[in-house]
Design a protein with these regions (language model features):
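Receiver (REC) domain active-site loop signature in two-component systems and cognate sites
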Residues: 58, 180, 306
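Active-site beta3 strand of CheY-like receiver
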Residues: 47-53, 79-80, 311
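Alpha4 helix (beta4-alpha4-beta5 surface) of REC/receiver domains from two-component response regulators
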Residues: 65-68, 72, 85-106, 360
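Two-component/phosphorelay signaling modules centered on CheY-like receiver
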Residues: 13-32
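EAL-family c-di-GMP phosphodiesterase catalytic domain
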Residues: 2, 85, 107-118, 235-237, ...
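Helix N-cap/capping motif at the beta->alpha junctions
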Residues: 33-42, 63
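Bacterial c-di-GMP phosphodiesterase EAL domain
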Residues: 141-255
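Active-site residues of response regulator receiver
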Residues: 10, 55, 317
Length: 399
């Protein structure tokens, strides 16, 4: 991280200088400073930073404004909140920042010490280094998304899900990316909003991704009947009455048993027409597809859906998993979600696992499976296949 670029945002000069000194002693050479949110936004607009330390309480455009700007800018570097506010405020701010899809590493309370900064930098160094340029892409319009669909620019990416105890890959989640004419990788947060505005667009996009993923999956693993493949399905897609029949037909045409397919129902799947959505989910279930409730804990009606529909799987949202070691509320949500699912006979998958310590916490809580950068980032199937054939080395465990 010697050549990394870090921005320190704080209205107190002594804090900025203290942080800069600590970072310099840790080998960081490229350090920028801003004394308020406005200066920070100007720097962020013209520089690429690997990490940003940001205060909350500043007189000219506070830290919340900076976080909002980072979210709109699709910033993928590390974000560290620094403040003298009470722990509950810091924890809530972290959760808010994750709604912007920001990579919150932690909260640092003032006064700042070298030991605290060293711990933060050590954490950052352990994490995969995302490609900021790849995700710094504005939101596409419906017309632009239609162009990419017509030009066959969609690519199916996959992220493995591992059994937390054996470290064997038990399934894959199919994700979608766009690779444009200039080989620029465009992430879903830049085009899903446009797709969700049109029932036709989101259906077309979903079907294209499913077809591409099934083709790759069937070719790469023709005899792996125990390996599951999961798809994200939104409410607008489920409102199409013909979708279950289409899915059954396309899966069968690839020679894949429906029991290998998991339909991950996102929170948006709960909103448009609850009765229609429930009926469609039951149709999928009767066709022998497995059902998963995605991003559990983030929606107002998640528990009601869990009661109403015979789900096979519950996925704990990454916002709770990420800080379950530092946020008592997140830890409680994770533990109680697992306990509830177990009582109902439902498998539990944790999203967003990035460290061994978080993995250990989940194991002790009884979580079945997990996915995240600790194991593998999403990628084309030919890049993921080797991990499936070679289990991740398991640590010695006493539990």
């Amino acid at each position: 991280m010697t050549h990394s670029s870090i921005l320190v945002v704080d209205d107190q000069q002594v804090i900025r200088h203290t942080l800069a000194l600590c970072l310099g002693n840790l080998g960081i050479q490229n350090i920028h400073e801003a004394e308020n949110g406005k200066q920070a936004k100007d720097l962020i607009a013209f520089h690429t930073f690997d990490a940003i330390f940001c205060d909350l309480d500043m007189p000219i455009e506070d830290g919340f404004e900076v976080l909002r700007f980072l979210g709109e800018s699709k910033f993928t570097g590390a974000v560290i909140i620094i403040s003298s506010q009470e722990q509950e405020v810091l924890a809530s701010t972290s959760n808010l920042a994750r709604l912007y899809d920001l990579r919150i590493i932690g909260c640092v309370e003032k006064p700042i010490t070298f030991q605290i900064v060293q711990k933060v930098i050590d954490t950052i160094r352990m994490l995969p280094n995302p490609n900021n340029k790849a995700k710094r892409y504005r939101e596409l319009t419906e017309e632009e998304l239609t162009h990419h669909l017509n030009s066959d620019h969609l690519e199916a990416y996959f992220q493995p899900q591992l059994d937390l105890r054996t470290k064997k890959v038990k399934g894959l989640e199919a994700l979608v990316r766009i690779i444009d004419e200039n080989d620029l990788l465009i992430y879903p947060d830049s085009f899903i909003p446009a797709a969700e505005k049109s029932a036709t667009l989101i259906l077309n996009l979903t079907q294209r991704v499913i077809e591409k993923a099934l083709t790759s999956f069937a070719k790469e693993f023709p005899n792996r009947k125990s390996l599951t493949l999961a798809f994200n399905i939104s409410g607008k897609v489920l409102e199409n009455q013909e979708f279950p029949k289409w899915l059954s037909h396309i899966v069968n045409s690839h020679g894949i048993p429906p029991q290998q397919i998991i339909c991950e129902l996102t929170e948006t799947a709960i909103a448009p027409d609850p009765t229609t959505i429930d009926i469609q989910m039951l149709r999928l279930k009767m066709m022998q597809f497995k059902l998963s409730i995605d991003d559990f804990g983030t929606g107002y009606s998640s528990i009601a859906k869990l009661h109403a529909i015979p789900f096979n799987e519950l996925k704990i949202d990454k916002s709770f998993v990420f800080d379950c070691l530092t946020n008592a509320k997140s830890a409680a949500i994770v533990e109680q979600s697992i306990k509830m699912a177990k009582a109902m006979g439902i498998e539990v998958v944790a999203e967003g696992i990035e460290t061994n310590d978080v993995e250990d916490f989940l194991l002790k809580a009884g979580c079945d499976s997990g996915q995240g950068y600790l194991y593998s980032k999403p990628g084309p199937l030919d890049e993921i296949a080797s991990l499936i054939r070679t289990p991740v080395p398991n640590k010695e465990r006493t539990e």
